[in-house]
Amino acid sequence: MTVREELERQEHRRLNPKAAFADRSKGRPRFEPDREEDVRTCYQRDIDRIVHSKAFRRLMHKTQVFLQPEGDHYRTRMTHTLEVSRIASTITRALGLNEDLAEAIAMGHDLGHTPFGHAGEVALSECWGHPFRHNEQSLRVVDYLEKDGHGLNLSYEVRDGILCHTGDKYPDTLEGLIVRRSDQIAYVNHDIDDAIRAGILTNEDIPRAISDVLGHDHSQRINTLVCDIIRTSTKAGTVCLTPQVETALKDLRSFMFERVYRNPVAKGEETKARAMLQRLYEYYIAHPEALPEDFHPQLSFDGLGRTVCDYIAGMTDNYAVDKYTEIFIPSGWQVRG
């Protein structure tokens, strides 16, 4: 028996019968024969493929809510991804589900995010003329764009969880549902931290009715939400919150949209960011020869608009600014904010 087979046997001994077992995966887009020397389950291999990908490394230079904030402690897509992973791992472990699958989904769920957060999604949607959704782009990254067009060839359950971590369609696995919830828990709580750091909020601004249910600081809120999911899901046999906590979380998200996500401080640079990406899109549409050479073969398969979207979506915030400066700002000039 190989090490991998022993790990798969251990999963059957210790995990909840409702868990997604590695040896029951629906497989990969392209068949890969088992290798006797591989000591990892399919989901463990998927984690490693994602973490070693170029798209994953770029997450550290893509901002979350505040565009290019001054300071070292604001969240990026990378820190958000790690927080989602830790929350999801805690919940899956407590419920006896597959931590490896949850971690793989969490690590890959935001790989397709544009520079400048959701402002980038809006910009590309307007330019391209089609809805640009980061969850669909994340799947495109792992299926196609990574490894020079070959993709990472991830397991079905990981790909499903990445695609369905947001939007109307829900994941097929409980682990995918947990990552979807963990994403909500992570971003609403760390965005409060960043808003407090930016001077937009204080903890006292959060409505008392919400704080009395979820807690009065970052640690209390996350602990309440995680523990409530664990207790409620154990009894219900699915991933859910109690009605009281569900309502409080929904109200907290509404509060954050009103006070933070639509706040002039958070949104002040969005107009500039959208205009920057739109001008880059228009430039590459007019000058496809200026695209990097590794994107040229894609033009004949996907068309110019789709290829330009892929290129811009893969940019980090700083790279987008640098390309804009290189193309549109005369050498030696400085842009004043």
Locate predicted features.
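Histidine-centered, transition-metal-coordinating active-site segments
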Residues: 1-77, 81, 85-91, 98-99, ...
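Short active-site segment of divalent metal-dependent hydrolases/proteases
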Residues: 112-113, 186
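Gly/Ser/Thr-rich helix-start
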Residues: 113, 118, 315
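A glycine- and small-aliphatic-rich helix-loop capping segment at beta-alpha/alpha-beta transitions
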Residues: 117-128
